[in-house]
């Protein structure tokens, strides 16, 4: 994981960023919306009638995309420790998805309905120490993968942000154990200097 540029340089880059401008114009809460839009255009992940869980959802741009593409048919359930302002059509559960009480809320909300797609655009708080940040990021991916194994229906799909570096190959191997196919995506909205990519696990294997 690479260091962020200085605050002044980052602010200048942010203000001039094509995807930031598009997000403001299109009403998305973050430029990350265009990452999911591009991946979904390519892989056709989101289909009307689906139940989708968005892990680490705040500020909510991926939930916005998901609910738009469901077109009123299906459900988006978003989870985050942080607060997230309401999004029409999105059910939000605030809390840590590792905790039993939060999972019980999710279970009650699902009411026996299987999850078709898990999406997770999570990143740790950046310390600036590369090895520490990489380990934190890998841990988040492991948590999301564990969640997908538990909650995704057989044949369901899983999309997660990963930072290329130490532990990356192990994450890919772990996903291959759980999904019939694993592919890497680097959408245009991912900054070139960023080591982030998205791993897509297709068709969860039967447990």
Curated annotation (Swiss-Prot):
Active site: 161
Keywords, comma-separated and alphabetical: Cytoplasm, Methyltransferase, rRNA processing, S-adenosyl-L-methionine, Transferase
EC number: 2.1.1.166
Enzymatic reactions: uridine(2552) in 23S rRNA + S-adenosyl-L-methionine = 2'-O-methyluridine(2552) in 23S rRNA + S-adenosyl-L-homocysteine + H(+)
MF terms in GO: rRNA (uridine-2'-O-)-methyltransferase activity
Top EC category: transferase
Alphabetized InterPro entries for the sequence: RNA_methyltr_RlmE, RNA_MeTrfase_FtsJ_dom, rRNA-MeTfrase_E, SAM-dependent_MTases_sf
Keyword Transcription recorded: no
Primary localization class, coarse: cytoplasm
GO cellular component: cytoplasm
Subcellular location: Cytoplasm
Pfam families, A to Z: FtsJ
Protein task: Specifically methylates the uridine in position 2552 of 23S rRNA at the 2'-O position of the ribose in the fully assembled 50S ribosomal subunit.
NCBIfam families membership: PRK11188.1
Family matches, as HAMAP family: RNA_methyltr_E (MF_01547)
Protein name: Ribosomal RNA large subunit methyltransferase E
Protein source organism: Methylobacillus flagellatus (strain ATCC 51484 / DSM 6875 / VKM B-1610 / KT)
């Amino acid at each position: 994981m690479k260091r962020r540029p200085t605050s002044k340089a980052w602010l200048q880059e942010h203000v001039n960023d094509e995807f930031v401008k598009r997000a403001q114009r299109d009403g998305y809460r973050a430029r990350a919306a265009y990452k999911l839009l591009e991946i979904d255009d390519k892989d056709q992940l989101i289909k009307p009638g689906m139940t989708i869980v968005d892990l680490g959802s705040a500020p909510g741009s991926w939930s916005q995309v998901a609910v738009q593409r469901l077109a009123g048919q299906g459900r988006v359930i978003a989870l985050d420790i942080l607060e997230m302002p309401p999004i029409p059509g999105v059910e939000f559960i605030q809390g840590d998805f590792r905790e039993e009480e939060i999972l019980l809320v999710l279970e009650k909300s699902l009411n026996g309905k299987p999850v078709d797609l898990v999406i997770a655009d999570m990143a740790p708080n950046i310390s600036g120490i590369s090895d520490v940040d990489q380990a934190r990021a890998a841990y988040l991916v492991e948590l999301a993968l564990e969640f997908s194994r538990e909650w995704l229906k057989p044949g369901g799909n899983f999309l997660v942000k990963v930072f290329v570096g130490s532990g990356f190959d192990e994450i890919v191997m772990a996903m291959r154990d759980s999904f019939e196919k694993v592919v890497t995506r680097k959408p245009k909205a991912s900054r070139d200097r960023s080591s982030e990519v998205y791993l897509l696990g297709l068709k969860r294997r039967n447990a």
